[in-house]
UniProtKB/Swiss-Prot annotation:
GO terms for biological process: DNA recombination; positive regulation of metabolic process; regulation of DNA-templated transcription; regulation of translation. It comes from the Bacteria. Disulfide bonds: none annotated. This is Integration host factor subunit alpha. Heterodimer of an alpha and a beta chain. HAMAP family: IHF_alpha. The lineage of its organism: Bacteria, Pseudomonadati, Pseudomonadota, Alphaproteobacteria, Hyphomicrobiales. The keyword DNA-binding applies. GO terms for molecular function: DNA binding; structural constituent of chromatin. Coiled coil: none annotated. CDD domains: IHF_A. PANTHER family: DNA-BINDING PROTEIN HU, INTEGRATION HOST FACTOR SUBUNIT ALPHA. Keywords: DNA recombination, DNA-binding, Transcription, Transcription regulation, Translation regulation. Belongs to the bacterial histone-like protein family.
Length: 107
């Protein structure tokens, strides 16, 4: 089920092949895009990439957790977390690819 991990270099290479920019320009473009996304998220903005996903920062309140070894209650401090919500388009593509692979493996 697992596959290759796609890196920044892989994205830059794909831009190089598909867009025709130089490798240096492609890598710089990927970095600029990722920097913009990161800056927006850090500033608490929601980043919505249609047909892909939404990245959002949420505040979580303090709550009581439990140490699994001792059972002792431990306070979990309030914090900010980033959430990733895949779009319905992406979810559908994932499902279709899974179904194709399942069909091939049954033959």
């Amino acid at each position: 089920m697992g596959g290759k991990t796609v890196t920044r270099a892989d994205l830059a290479e794909a831009v190089y092949r598909k867009v025709g920019l130089s490798r240096t320009e492609s890598a710089a473009l990927v970095e600029m895009i990722l920097d913009e996304v990161c800056d927006a998220i850090v500033n608490g903005e929601t980043v919505k990439l249609s047909s892909f996903a939404t990245f959002q920062v949420r505040d979580k309140n303090e709550r009581i957790g439990r140490n699994p070894k001792t059972g002792e209650e431990v306070p979990i401090l309030p914090r900010r977390v980033m959430t990733f919500k895949a779009s319905n388009v992406l979810k559908q593509r994932i499902l279709q690819e899974h179904q194709k692979r399942e069909t091939k493996s049954q033959k």
